[in-house]
């Protein structure tokens, strides 16, 4: 269990509780979680973060009524800046989006502006929103993470409790390499409900070479770990930076969707440009 799982800041969340579904617009349904909850234990301070990045959300279940009452549907793309005070709690996001279902809006841009305003207010940070008509995305190919997959290793694993021990002495030699490693075996659990979160992760770095077996064991150790997606990515970035000391580092995870939403956080200290195309499990 994370050290802050019972923090007072989490007590008021609807997550893990029985809730009513509202279908008329209600911005108060959105709930934020302070990023400081996981950053403080990691020694990360808001005014001196070792990374940049965004939390990329895809909204697959977004619908509202136009001015004449005709239902509209869209796929939404949301980017929440890493400097925001709060992350957005996903169940509250789902409930909030449901409140659009029977609400009339004059046009698509009014919907986009409403989302942008409400999410920015909840997160206390910068948010950008784009809405796509379905025919704009039809035929879009399934994406993939560029890099070398480290999953197919003939090793025995018997520990699934989170530990950074595997990263001790995980680099070798003095030669500087630049490589991108990928794993589809990332699995963590919701901080509150402990429901499984499934993801793929891309780690791009420049520095002394990281032992792939040790890295895979470290990633698999998240299997019983309880934290939100964004918190896991920041923990992985921080641990790799601390133990492996790369000159450049980027960590990007794309998680499978739940409740019509997927969350795809990335953190980097270099010029990293994430691909936003959904992966095969998304």
From Swiss-Prot:
It catalyses: 7-aminomethyl-7-carbaguanine + 2 NADP(+) = 7-cyano-7-deazaguanine + 2 NADPH + 3 H(+). Pathway: tRNA modification; tRNA-queuosine biosynthesis. Its EC number is 1.7.1.13. It is an enzyme of class 1 (oxidoreductase). It is found in: Cytoplasm. Signal peptide: none annotated. NADPH binds at residues 90-91, 258-259. It holds the Pfam family QueF_N. The active site is at residues 190, 197. It comes from the Bacteria. Keywords: Cytoplasm, NADP, Oxidoreductase, Queuosine biosynthesis. Substrate binds at residues 88-90, 229-230. PANTHER family: NADPH-DEPENDENT 7-CYANO-7-DEAZAGUANINE REDUCTASE. HAMAP family: QueF_type2. NCBIfam families: QueF. Belongs to the GTP cyclohydrolase I family. QueF type 2 subfamily. This is NADPH-dependent 7-cyano-7-deazaguanine reductase. It comes from Escherichia coli O157:H7.
């Amino acid at each position: 269990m994370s050290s802050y799982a019972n923090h007072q800041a989490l007590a008021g969340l609807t997550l893990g509780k029985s809730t009513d579904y509202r279908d008329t617009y209600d911005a108060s349904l959105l709930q934020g979680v302070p990023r400081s909850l996981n950053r403080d234990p990691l020694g990360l301070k808001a005014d001196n973060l070792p990374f940049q990045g965004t939390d990329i959300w895809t909204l697959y279940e977004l619908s509202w009524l136009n001015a004449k009452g005709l239902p509209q549907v869209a796929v939404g793309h949301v980017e929440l800046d890493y400097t925001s005070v709060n992350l957005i709690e996903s169940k509250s996001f789902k409930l909030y989006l449901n409140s659009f279902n029977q609400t009339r809006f004059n046009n698509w841009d009014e919907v986009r502006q409403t989302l942008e305003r409400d999410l920015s207010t909840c997160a206390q940070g910068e948010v950008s929103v784009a809405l796509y008509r379905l025919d704009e995305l039809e035929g879009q190919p399934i994406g993939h993470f560029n890099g070398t997959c480290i999953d197919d290793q003939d090793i025995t694993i018997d520990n699934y409790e989170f530990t950074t021990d595997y990263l001790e002495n995980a680099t070798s030699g003095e030669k500087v390499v630049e490589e991108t490693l990928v794993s589809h075996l990332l699995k963590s659990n919701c901080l509150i409900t402990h429901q499984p979160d499934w993801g793929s992760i891309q780690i791009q770095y420049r520095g002394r070479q990281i032992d792939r077996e040790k890295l895979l064991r470290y990633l698999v150790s998240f299997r019983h770990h309880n934290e939100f997606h964004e918190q896991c990515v920041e923990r992985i970035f921080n641990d790799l930076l601390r133990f492996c000391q790369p000159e450049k580092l980027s960590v990007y995870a794309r998680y499978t969707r739940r409740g019509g939403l997927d969350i795809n956080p990335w953190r980097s200290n270099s010029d990293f440009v994430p691909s936003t195309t959904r992966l095969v499990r998304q």
